[in-house]
Amino acid sequence: MPRTLSLHEITDLLETDDSIEASAIVIQPPENATAPVSDEESGDEEGGTINNLPGSLLHTAAYLIQDGSDAESDSDDPSYAPKDDSPDEVPSTFTVQQPPPSRRRKMTKILCKWKKADLTVQPVAGRVTAPPNDFFTVMRTPTEILELFLDDEVIELIVKYSNLYACSKGVHLGLTSSEFKCFLGIIFLSGYVSVPRRRMFWEQRTDVHNVLVSAAMRRDRFETIFSNLHVADNANLDPVDKFSKLRPLISKLNERCMKFVPNETYFSFDEFMVPYFGRHGCKQFIRGKPIRFGYKFWCGATCLGYICWFQPYQGKNPNTKHEEYGVGASLVLQFSEALTEAHPGQYHFVFNNFFTSIALLDKLSSMGHQATGTVRKDHIDRVPLESDVALKKKERGTFDYRIDGKGNIVCRWNDNSVVTVASSGAGIHPLCLVSRYSQKLKKKIQVQQPNMIKVYNQFMGGVDRADENIDKYRASIRGKKWYSSPLLFCFELVLQNAWQLHKTYDEKPVDFLEFRRRVVCHYLETHGHPPEPGQKGRPQKRNIDSRYDGINHVIVKQGKQTRCAECHKNTTFRCEKCDVALHVKCSVEYHTE
């Protein structure tokens, strides 16, 4: 019976016979795999060689898969039999047991023929249906635009699950829609009126006291609502979805954001970081970003910053649709399908090198869309472009390009550094000139730029613009629970989207700060409930330094009797500077340290 070859014998064959082309070597676990101590590789963790393999691994039975061989057509016999006409030839497989097939579908690589030619294609038409102008036939206030997203259904969902969660803890919350809007107004106000501690909004000291907040909601009531805020039923959470506590709200806001998308043709897709400094399995660290620690959201947006679609990153995506294209490309395809379903049409998508691949461009083209994006070298195999090193030695503005038979063009352009861009909707021409500063000449010079680079620069920054808008007035009130940061981000996102619609459809738009202030004032003045007469609050704290300075402490008569700050008996006099009730006879003792 033919014997099974070991890993050591197979590697010897590969080293001595150059005619053998192997695509993979599959080995069995070594005999000491379950032993408490096993021999280890002597090489480094990265960049090791075949000479560093341990002896137990070299003597393990293995089989070799040659290029072009079909592993599924092998015989069930675990051994092998050489061919009669060439006994020295290595068979296509040496096997003892085939590994289980991978669950993930893999893309078949198709080699393309590239030639040096420009891409000539007409721009896509954009949306087929008309934009939702019927919602803006009359002038809408900032609050009315915001409530296109935070409508009665969304507010009732938050109120329902917050009351349900409080009830499960034995607390009668009794939250109403009007009270939640007042609560949300305080959250929005903290974005442009920031205090070190949120309780300082309700302090009576004149340096931090906020009349609008303290007159709208009691401090303890705000804390109770914040600690019980929920948007899902904890008894029915999806164990696979790590963001199931937020999923009902995210789904509803995605529907509304997609419903009111402005009539645009170009959409960008990128990541968005939400700051978070606690512990959670989905927390990310991205070096070089303005926000390095926090939750990562995938967002699709217009070039001006209206976010149409967003999903939180949670490692393995529960949605396995299009997973054969990879993590980044599958998300772009999910966004494109959601956009096309809500607004049928043909669009141009722009994204960075995390998402771009030739397979993704082909897939979007088959759906009637176009795309442009920077691309990594390993995502464009065997494109005969000039190397980065060669282009870097040439003058600024030099570029090289190739196009395949399916209408995908790849261009490598030398600017400050060499950048590679792939596109199915923009070519090299018309060339444009851009201004750059030359270190050598010590002046600005004109550099030629391909059209596809211009398209990428013009339409890529939508998500970054939204990030900048939100971060400028991000709510300073934060909770300790892991979901408080992404939950408040959802409210910030729809407020920013409402402002984008206001800019698009209003004849006299205001800036984001003024828009935010109008929403805050409306919510706190309309839905706030001032403290009832007779409610007793904390005693007012006075500045000790001014109390004992001995300057201008004048005792004046007041209209009604109040308690003396020194002897606590009723008096009709008060200190005008300290603003406390005070007998004339108690003034010296009160103002002496």
Swiss-Prot record:
One of its GO terms (cellular component) is nucleus. This is PiggyBac transposable element-derived protein 3. Its main location: nucleus. Residues 27-53, 69-105 are annotated as: Disordered. It is found in: Nucleus. PGBD3 gene is located within ERCC6 intron 5. It comes from the Eukaryota. The modification Phosphoserine is found at residue 86. One of its GO terms (molecular function) is sequence-specific DNA binding. Residues 38-47 have a biased composition (Acidic residues). Changing residue 415 to G: In a breast cancer sample; somatic mutation. The keyword GTP-binding does not apply. Keywords: DNA-binding, Nucleus, Phosphoprotein. Binds in vitro to PGBD3-related transposable elements, called MER85s; these non-autonomous 140 bp elements are characterized by the presence of PGBD3 terminal inverted repeats and the absence of internal transposase ORF. The gene is PGBD3. It comes from Homo sapiens. Expressed in heart and oocytes, but not in granulosa cells (at protein level).
